[in-house]
Amino acid sequence: MVFPMWTLKRQILILFNIILISKLLGARWFPKTLPCDVTLDVPKNHVIVDCTDKHLTEIPGGIPTNTTNLTLTINHIPDISPASFHRLDHLVEIDFRCNCVPIPLGSKNNMCIKRLQIKPRSFSGLTYLKSLYLDGNQLLEIPQGLPPSLQLLSLEANNIFSIRKENLTELANIEILYLGQNCYYRNPCYVSYSIEKDAFLNLTKLKVLSLKDNNVTAVPTVLPSTLTELYLYNNMIAKIQEDDFNNLNQLQILDLSGNCPRCYNAPFPCAPCKNNSPLQIPVNAFDALTELKVLRLHSNSLQHVPPRWFKNINKLQELDLSQNFLAKEIGDAKFLHFLPSLIQLDLSFNFELQVYRASMNLSQAFSSLKSLKILRIRGYVFKELKSFNLSPLHNLQNLEVLDLGTNFIKIANLSMFKQFKRLKVIDLSVNKISPSGDSSEVGFCSNARTSVESYEPQVLEQLHYFRYDKYARSCRFKNKEASFMSVNESCYKYGQTLDLSKNSIFFVKSSDFQHLSFLKCLNLSGNLISQTLNGSEFQPLAELRYLDFSNNRLDLLHSTAFEELHKLEVLDISSNSHYFQSEGITHMLNFTKNLKVLQKLMMNDNDISSSTSRTMESESLRTLEFRGNHLDVLWREGDNRYLQLFKNLLKLEELDISKNSLSFLPSGVFDGMPPNLKNLSLAKNGLKSFSWKKLQCLKNLETLDLSHNQLTTVPERLSNCSRSLKNLILKNNQIRSLTKYFLQDAFQLRYLDLSSNKIQMIQKTSFPENVLNNLKMLLLHHNRFLCTCDAVWFVWWVNHTEVTIPYLATDVTCVGPGAHKGQSVISLDLYTCELDLTNLILFSLSISVSLFLMVMMTASHLYFWDVWYIYHFCKAKIKGYQRLISPDCCYDAFIVYDTKDPAVTEWVLAELVAKLEDPREKHFNLCLEERDWLPGQPVLENLSQSIQLSKKTVFVMTDKYAKTENFKIAFYLSHQRLMDEKVDVIILIFLEKPFQKSKFLQLRKRLCGSSVLEWPTNPQAHPYFWQCLKNALATDNHVAYSQVFKETV
């Protein structure tokens, strides 16, 4: 009972984890500022964080602590330290590829000149880590301090040129090791690539080892016996030793391709072995490989395949012998007798140089391949394909794919394929097959000449065989073995397929397809067929479901075209623009009415601008692709003939009319749309306006694509235009703002794409939360958001919503104001924009008080006396003038001078005071600041009293003193007596030449010249000066005033 109880507890625990993770799906458990995509793989209990190509310069914070798979590829992170993965203890996989790609391999506009720095023990704390990808980082050596749990290590496309045993001591549990692309023509090392003897000996659990693209000159010695996959292709190995693979009895995949390559027409730097010799492989080299299933000997310059190689590898399922020199060997091929389990055989591009064979010669040994499913013989290069050429294949009951493309076949009897009932794909693409002029049942042929002529084939057509490393991965993908499918998968899924694309067929007739009634898919694209089809050409193809007639010169003169294909479901007549571009030719687009089960029709890139039939008709068609035509001509303003072109496609659900140069849609277009239309694409038309209200005509519309146009507005209220719309795509337009009630009541909307527009602001009323909560996807990146206080609600919403917004942390950014330019909307701190009433009142009050005090202090400093004067002036105007009661004068004169100027002080005391207070003459009682002011009393009060208690105020003037505040205050107080008491008490004495430009001084001299005196420079004139001063002090000023001044005062 213990075991069942333990099982029950374990099941409960697993169920609990699943429920917990499912709950996390609806809760925000990582910060939105994380610039990565976070997904959950519930069956595997994985938390996947993908930070691919996010322009990161450091590992971002906020990564969930329960992350198991972390991808940081295609960024610019310069270093890794033990703190980089702090608290990420559950990591199982780290993908850190392409953060510093070697300069020859990387982008030239963003070259990395400082290689990735990995500090010691950066990964040692990750005890659950199993997979580590460090490709494309310019590393010089294998990192040290790796955790013992590591099972996969990938170090491709670095600068590791030496493999030493001591560098691998920490990888005792490693199972997969990728060390390729560290030294080849695109990532040169300029040194000899070295592998220490027995370097891999202690890797007792190693299963997969890749040393591809490294200029390795020999198979490493003493490889682990646990290896199941060994990749040594694209190196410089010239010879395989007899014992190189002796202990690899578990090996299942061996790839030796590209050693001693065949360099003819190679689209990359290629160095053959000396004298163009083949890769030397001893006959018993593979004897120990009893479990081998895949052997690749592509481009090894082989001229002969010894049967002895395959004596002990009778489990082989895939053999690649393409791009060698085995044209003659294909006619013998005794080695095939030793391959009873072979499923896939590739003998492509083994043609003899400058030889154009009359026919293909297949060895009878092919008949022994009872398990064979795929046979590829491209690039054999021969003229005529006859039935007996394929006779060795007649009894291969499992054969499904026969690929004879790129052979430059001119004559082919297609009826021979009736004997291959189990064939699913017959590939005759990229040949020169053309029709005969008679009605014989030979099939496609040309007037053949029996002589063999010299021919140089253009074998660059198929890059699959001429790619340097067809299994190489890009920075975005880490999968290794990519499958190759030469036939259109959508065609292949229907069943037996014949591919005649890219031939020289210019005419077809029913006899060409005699005995091919079993075909389900026929590909005739890329030929020169320019005939007028009348409905008889494909009559034998009674079971045909898919016809690819693209890239020809179809002439739709008859509405009966293709009508003989009663079971046709998919028809592609794209890129048949030849006759559609000509004037005055009949085009019957209503041919569809005779195709009773047609489901999908592709008419793209035909430049259709006219049609004899006004409507297309079909009761079965569900998808119509009409891209790249000229509906702008058919729907020209004022021409209503073609507005119902699609009206009679009664079951049409998907219509693509992108790239039709439609700058506007006539009003009747929507009324002429099919009644059951669900998906409508109007992308890339240059639309400047759109009649949103007309969407009411499309009652079932679910998806509307208006991307890549020039629209500037959205509907006032989307729900008033369509109640069925679920997906709206408006990316790449010129939309600057959203209407106030844009999504009001649009509860059915699930997907909205507003990316790559010029939207600056999104208001709450435009995005009601009860609608947004129903959205599954919202795209807002690459807009021009203004992150002002008006965006408070939007910033708050994106931080709290559970709607998926791709690129939120990286590409939903601000264009302004300056402080926020380039900053992510999600990371904005708009605390200062909170509209709290108390905060607003306190802020307004404090700023008002501060401004008031600042203004008052400034005004008091600059305009005190002006304000004081204006105040009293206004007061006098209102209340009338009242003479101030002043005490009797105590002094004859108050002397105002610059007490800080020693020269002036000396003149006042030695000259002026001595002359005016001399008891021998008539003396005057003078008031001096330094002598008569009361100590401790404010300066302003002393000054005011001195002026009030003196009959006259004498100003001893210098240029320097005239600019001081003391002079200005004293002068204003003295002048105030003129305003209040109408008494002029001012006398000016200039010790320096007076200011000639002073208007006040010039006016005073004219009106009261006796009050303005100058100290003469001639000593003889001094007595006259003193006499004038005494007269001015002794006499009232008004006596000396001019008549004009008296009247003014």
Curated annotation (Swiss-Prot):
Residues 861-1049 are cytoplasmic. GO terms for cellular component: cytoplasm; early phagosome; endolysosome membrane; endoplasmic reticulum; endoplasmic reticulum membrane; endosome; endosome membrane; Golgi membrane. The keyword Repeat applies. Residues 1-26 form the signal peptide. Residues 27-839 are extracellular. Gene3D superfamilies: Ribonuclease Inhibitor, Toll/interleukin-1 receptor homology (TIR) domain. Endosomal receptor that plays a key role in innate and adaptive immunity. Controls host immune response against pathogens through recognition of uridine-containing single strand RNAs (ssRNAs) of viral origin or guanosine analogs. Upon binding to agonists, undergoes dimerization that brings TIR domains from the two molecules into direct contact, leading to the recruitment of TIR-containing downstream adapter MYD88 through homotypic interaction. Belongs to the Toll-like receptor family. This is Toll-like receptor 7. The gene is TLR7.
